[in-house]
Amino acid sequence: MSADALKDVIGGGKDLYALLEVSISSPEELEAVDAAQLRAQFRRLALRYHPDKRRDDTQQNDKFVSVQKAYDILSNSSLRATYNRWLSCRLFGDPERRRLVRELHQREQLQVRQKEPMDKDIQNIQSYGQLLRKMRHLRIPYGDWRPNTSISRDSTLVETCTLRLLLRQNSTTNSKSSMLQLFQRAKLHIVDLYFSSRNVDTENDLVLYAVMPDVDTMLDLLNNWAVKPPLSEHILQVQPRVHTDYFHFKTDISLDKTITEAIDADNQYMSSF
């Protein structure tokens, strides 16, 4: 974990100990927290919030990321010493100064939240508009344009064609070789199988990831797993590894005035031909 991450945490006024559910009420308690206590809290919370167990709950997934970041910083002795000095001053310093700093920070954060999303989207739209205007000026048909970057088809399909299987935990599903045999009997070709690192032996289910060779095979298993015995006898649920909710955009942003003016100028230019 880098010093930049620590700077962001301090700038955001975050209490990392509170994220790990470690109670701090005095400077002495702050210094008394040891690595073993932090590690135990992280493991407990990681099991509670890990995405493998709460895949559809984005709030819980965000909580897991916050817990991971908190532990990464506090488990680094150098970063933790710097953070503890800041937190001690924030929690146990002058009350009036803390109140003023907190109010100032809240106002700054509100201004950032209101400005940043629109600025970022507008920059992207403006850059895209500049590209289109260059193509039009050079008389390059839009349909002839190709990206100038090379992306491996195999690397993108690994994400697209990976399914998350929730299985009943038993001697068969705990064995990769046994699961490969079940896929073969179901006439499903598999590129790879791997278990989630967060599976727990004492639970009734476990998570297995199946990498399919192509989209058609992936969709076949995703949509028809219930009619593929004997594999289906062990499956509780099948989902894409990359959840489709990540591709939903719910915010509508009005175009910047400079963009609408550029569009009008382009329309006037084209109408002159």
UniProtKB/Swiss-Prot annotation:
Record's keyword terms, sorted: Chaperone, Cytoplasm, mRNA processing, mRNA splicing, Nucleus, Spliceosome
GO molecular function: misfolded protein binding; protein-folding chaperone binding
GO CC annotation terms, alphabetical: endoplasmic reticulum; spliceosomal complex
Span of domain J: 15-87
Xref: SUPFAM superfamilies: Chaperone J-domain
UniProt xrefs under SMART domains: DnaJ (SM00271)
InterPro entries: DnaJ_domain (IPR001623), DnaJ_domain_CS (IPR018253), Hsp70_co-chaperone_J-domain (IPR051948), J_dom_sf (IPR036869)
Intracellular or extracellular location(s): Cytoplasm; Nucleus
Record-level GO BP terms: ERAD pathway; mRNA processing; RNA splicing
Superkingdom of origin: Eukaryota
PANTHER family xref list: DNAJ HOMOLOG SUBFAMILY B MEMBER 9 (PTHR44360:SF1)
Assembly: Associated with the spliceosome.
Assigned protein family: Belongs to the DnaJ family.
Stated role: Involved in pre-mRNA splicing. May be involved in endoplasmic reticulum-associated protein degradation (ERAD) and required for growth at low and high temperatures.
Name of the protein described by the UniProt record: Pre-mRNA-splicing factor CWC23
Organism whose genome encodes this protein: Eremothecium gossypii (strain ATCC 10895 / CBS 109.51 / FGSC 9923 / NRRL Y-1056) (Yeast)
